[in-house]
Amino acid sequence: IRAVTRTAESITAGDLGDPWTPTQGAATWRDGVLKATTDSPDCRRLLDALYADDLFGASGGARAVAALDDAMDQAQLRYQVLALNAADVDRTLAWLQSLPRTCGTFTAVTAHGAVQNVEVKEADLPQAGDARQGLRVTLRGQTPDGDPTVLTMDVAAVRVGGDTIAVTHGGMGDVWADATRAAVQTGVQRLSEIRRSGRVEV
């Protein structure tokens, strides 16, 4: 039976390079913007998944987790490796793929009563793993003082054999898609190497 350490399966700040560092805690925009609701069940499920950093539901236990900060652009990236049933993963990938059509644009209301105009688009991912889906979600609103706000979230899910990678990457400033793609590419390579080697790490 193959066993691997969480470190072996995960990615690190070094994989993404400067300015990424280990996280200093949850960003304030998570509660201020992502804790929101809307009428459509599919769109509400998306908001809930983004808020919880959980694309696959509470039953999905993460074997490896990396949480990283980009202090320069005030962005955060969360990378998870999960052991899930392939059919369940494919159903979630199909749901994610449908969202640019079913939730392309919609309005959400935060816990503080602020209105967010949400846009969901498909995002390109590396041709890595057995199946994959990426999204870019943009939430536009205003501060209580009337200043415009924009929260951008990249979402990526990739099935790699019996493993699944989930990445969320967001912030109120620039959110570079290259970092999302690098996390996916590095993660798939790492899992593939571990599976090929079949070695046990303790």
Task: Show which residues each predicted segment covers.
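A short, solvent-exposed beta-edge/loop patch
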Residues: 118-190
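Sec/Tat-exported extracytoplasmic proteins
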Residues: 14-20, 24, 96, 100-107, ...
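Short C-terminal domain-edge/linker segments immediately following a structured domain
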Residues: 53, 109-115, 166-171, 187-190, ...
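Extracytoplasmic/periplasmic, Sec-exported soluble proteins
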Residues: 8, 71, 81-84, 175-179
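N-terminal low-complexity, Pro/Thr-rich disordered segments
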Residues: 1-8, 38-41, 46-49, 195-202
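Short basic (Lys/Arg) and small-residue
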Residues: 11
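A small/polar (G/S/T-enriched), proline-flanked helix-loop surface module common
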Residues: 22-147
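Generic alpha-helical secondary structure signal
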Residues: 14, 41, 87-90, 178, ...
